[in-house]
Every structure is written in C-alpha cells, then in structure tokens.
Regions:
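Low-complexity, Ser/Thr/Pro/Gly-rich disordered linker/stalk regions
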Residues: 4, 29, 33-199, 204-283
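Secretory targeting and sorting signals
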Residues: 1-29
Length: 283
C-alpha cells in the first residue's frame, strides 16, 4: 500500500468557506480515483468541520476545484440560485430528454468523489448535514406513480449501490439503506414545507462489521434544533459488493425507474445548500 497522501486544508468557522490546497484537476467519472492510499478523513486535527459547501461565491463547484458537478448536458441541469444573503445550487431533471440523462439514468447530481474531505473509509465516524428545498414540487395524489426521487446519497465507489440515501416518497421523505433493506420515514408530510428549507443530519459510524450505526435527524421550518427521527444500531454500514476502498457524497436529483409512460411528473427541481461533513471521532 502506498504511503498516505497528505492534503492541506484551511478550515474556518462552520458557516464559512473551506479552502483546499494541493488540489488536482477534477476527474470526469464519479467513481474515479482510489482512497486505498489515503488516511481516514477522521484523522484530521484541523477542525471538527471537514468540509463546508455553501455556494457563497455563486459557483457550481462552490470554489472547490475537485468538486464534481453534474454530468447531465442540459444547460439548466444544474445552476446557482440566490438564497438569503448568498446562493444555493439547483438540480433539474426532465424525463424523456437526453439532456438530463447522466450515467445512463435520469439524474443531475454533484459529488465529492474527488474531494479528500468528502470521502469516507472504514473507521470514520462522520456527520453529514444538508439543507434541501423542493422547488415548485408537484405533490403525489392517490393512484399516481409511487416512484421516489433520490435527493442525497452516501455512495460506495466502484459502481456500487449507495450505503444510504434520502428520497421523496409520495408526499414524505424516507431514509433507506438498499443493501440492508432498511427504510424509515423521517418526514411524514413535506407538503406544508414546499418552497421552504428543510434541514437534515445523518450520523454514520463506518464499519465493515455489525458494529456501525446510522442516526437520522431533521430540523423543519420553524424548529430551532434537530430532532432524532431514526437510529439503526449494530449494522454493517460499509458494504460494497464490488471492490471499493472509499465512499463519497452525492446530492441533487436522481429519478430511478421513472418514465413519462408510467405517468411520473415530467420535470422536478430541487435546491441544496450548506452541505457539511463533520468529524465525530473526537466526540
């Protein structure tokens, strides 16, 4: 195994930007690179905040050169929008239009596959926070297609299924681990919060045995703090089928198994902001 590659970061306040030194050109593929030679993200002693992506500068990569932006080719598959005092990122997918197809499926997503601080390995204990707004969202009615829209993933590299993801399901938001066949509703009804920012937190202990955990919390509009919604303890959280040494985060809009022929909503748009990775190993 190669010696660990050292990365230099300047971490500022949790609400501030993150500057990454020793950067390299972002790779085209979202599973590119290997983290076998890299130290655990949790080994960082700079700050509890490993990564803070807030789009304050109005750029799709939030000023982080290695951040992967959408592979969909439509001009509006991803764009920056005003949000409060600064900005957020929008992802859009229109079914039946090849401009919104990425890696063979209807999706438009950003990812940390080439950002060291956005990767995870066995042994890491990390917190993932993000804010999401469902923009001009058509709600589900009884009898309509029940296919869900994936809005955030903790993804194993190597073309594997995600370890976990959050998805809209009918008019709710659910947490799911597909390989472990775990699923729970964490937002019972998002309809009162359409066009508003909803905040999510996922704590994960990354293990390749049955000692890990997922803890999912939400902070809805009008709430002052996070509420724990679901805990899965004593589970194997790092479980790629294909060989993979690391995982990474993805956010945006992925619409698996959806088609116009099935009556799925033609166009969806979702906003994301304040994507953060925090080290829990010292807590």
């Amino acid at each position: 195994m190669k010696k660990s590659t050292k990365r230099s970061v300047i971490a500022v306040a949790a609400a501030g930007a993150l500057t990454i030194a020793c950067v390299a050109t972002a790779q085209a593929g979202q599973d590119s690179g290997s983290r076998a030679s890299e130290a655990s993200c949790s080994s960082s002693s700079v700050s509890a905040t490993l990564l803070d992506i807030e789009y304050a500068n109005g750029q799709l990569n939030s000023g982080i050169p290695n951040l992967t932006t959408t592979h969909a080719t439509a001009a509006d598959a991803s764009y920056v929008v005003d949000s409060g005092a600064d900005h957020a990122v929008a992802h859009k997918v229109t079914l039946g239009d090849p401009g919104y197809v990425s890696d063979g499926a209807p999706r438009s997503e950003s990812a940390t596959n080439d950002v060291h601080e956005g990767k995870f390995v066995v042994g890491d204990k990390q917190r993932y926070e993000f804010s999401v707004m469902l923009k001009d969202w058509e709600t589900w009615e009884s009898g309509e297609s029940e296919a869900g829209d994936i809005i955030f993933q903790g993804k194993h590299a190597g073309g594997n299924l995600p370890s976990f993801y959050l998805m809209t399901k009918r008019n709710s938001i659910a947490f799911r681990s597909p390989t472990l066949s775990l699923q729970s509703t964490v937002v019972d009804d998002f309809r009162p919060h359409l066009g508003q920012w909803m905040h999510f937190r996922v704590d994960v202990s990354w293990t390749d045995d049955s000692t890990g955990y997922y803890k999912v919390s939400t902070k809805m509009p009008g709430e002052s703090d996070y509420t724990l919604r679901q805990t899965y303890a004593n589970v194997k959280t790092f479980h790629p089928v294909n060989p993979a040494e690391f995982g990474y985060l993805k956010w945006g809009l992925y619409r698996p198994d959806q088609t116009l022929a099935k009556g799925d909503v033609p166009t969806r748009v979702v906003y994301h902001d304040d994507i953060r990775v925090l080290d829990l190993s010292q807590g």
